[in-house]
UniProtKB/Swiss-Prot annotation:
This protein is one of the early assembly proteins of the 50S ribosomal subunit, although it is not seen to bind rRNA by itself. It is important during the early stages of 50S assembly. The gene is rplM. This is Large ribosomal subunit protein uL13. One of its GO terms (cellular component) is cytosolic large ribosomal subunit. Part of the 50S ribosomal subunit. Keywords: Ribonucleoprotein, Ribosomal protein. HAMAP family: Ribosomal_uL13. One of its GO terms (molecular function) is mRNA binding.
Length: 147
């Protein structure tokens, strides 16, 4: 009888990918990146092991928001003090902190547990076209071919 293959943490080979976010819709980019971070693009996917690859996203400031999301989509967070509810729109994030906009979108698509937080650490977002990971020799991914 055959058993299902279960990957062990020592057997996993992690790759580095670089994705250009210029003129790519935020949600479509986020779903592809979340899938790569989880490792669901690998045939040996095991849900309880961090199998995901490292992803570098450049040009985050030029990501596209469709419809009226720039003004209508609101992100909330609370400071745990009375009256501490803060709200920022997606357009505000894109203008002042585009890295945070992509991180919020992608982290929302990862599991809400310790494994999901660990997988989220493999995401590296940069507002411009420069990044600090040239030594890892990242492989370029064309997001339009994956969507």
């Amino acid at each position: 009888m055959r058993t299902t293959f279960l990957a062990k943490p020592g057997e996993i080979e992690k790759k580095w990918y670089i994705i250009d976010a210029k003129d790519v819709v935020l949600g479509r980019l986020s779903t592809v990146v979340a899938s790569i971070l989880r490792g669901k693009n690998k045939p040996t996917f095991t849900p309880n092991v961090d199998m995901g690859d490292n992803v570098i996203i450049i040009n985050a400031s030029e990501v596209k928001l469709t419809g009226k999301k720039a003004t209508d989509k609101v992100y909330y967070h609370h400071s745990n003090h009375p009256g501490g509810l803060k709200a920022r729109t997606a357009g505000n994030y894109r203008e002042f902190n585009p890295e945070k906009l992509l991180e919020l979108s992608i982290h929302g698509m990862l599991p809400k547990n310790t494994l999901g937080r660990k997988q989220g650490l493999n995401l590296h977002v940069y507002a411009g076209s420069e990044h600090d990971h040239a030594a890892q020799k990242p492989e370029a991914l064309d997001i339009n071919k994956l969507v």
